[in-house]
């Protein structure tokens, strides 16, 4: 499973409508041991996270929620996750700017070192529809 987006995925994100905040749903599965002797996969990811959170906040974004993934209720139980994180950015452009910065790319090495697999889903708000509101 890929740890980074492929070119087509990155281009699709860049070309998507960018008129509202975007929330990134992160599903994270850590390696038992990080590559390169960085301790556990979670330790390596925490090194990435310290830099990434600061960069998110510099762009007007925020971590909305983070928690342990306790149980797969629906789906393949072999596809378990260790952590779920929701990060909101004011726009897709803010996210794309962040991930193209040299400091981010350097920190991303720790992310790659610590993750066994991940899913990153770009989401836009639809709560008004769930409440029976407009479109």
Task: Please describe what each predicted stretch is.
Residues 86-88, 93-135:
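Short, Lys/Arg-rich amphipathic alpha-helical interaction segments
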Residues 1-82, 90-94, 124-135:
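Short S/T/G/P-rich N-terminal loop/turn motif that feeds into the first structured element of a domain
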């Amino acid at each position: 499973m890929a740890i980074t987006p492929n070119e087509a995925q990155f281009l699709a994100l860049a070309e998507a409508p960018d008129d509202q905040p975007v929330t990134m749903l992160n599903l994270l599965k850590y390696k038992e041991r990080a590559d390169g002797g960085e301790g556990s996969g979670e330790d390596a990811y925490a090194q990435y996270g310290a830099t990434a959170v600061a960069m998110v906040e510099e762009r007007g974004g925020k971590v909305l929620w983070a928690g342990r993934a306790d149980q797969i209720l629906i789906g393949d139980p072999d596809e378990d996750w260790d952590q779920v994180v929701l990060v909101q950015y004011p726009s897709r452009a803010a996210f794309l700017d962040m991930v193209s910065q040299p400091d981010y790319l350097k920190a991303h090495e720790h992310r790659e070192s610590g993750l066994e697999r991940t899913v990153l889903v770009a989401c836009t708000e639809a709560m008004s529809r769930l409440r029976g509101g407009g479109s």
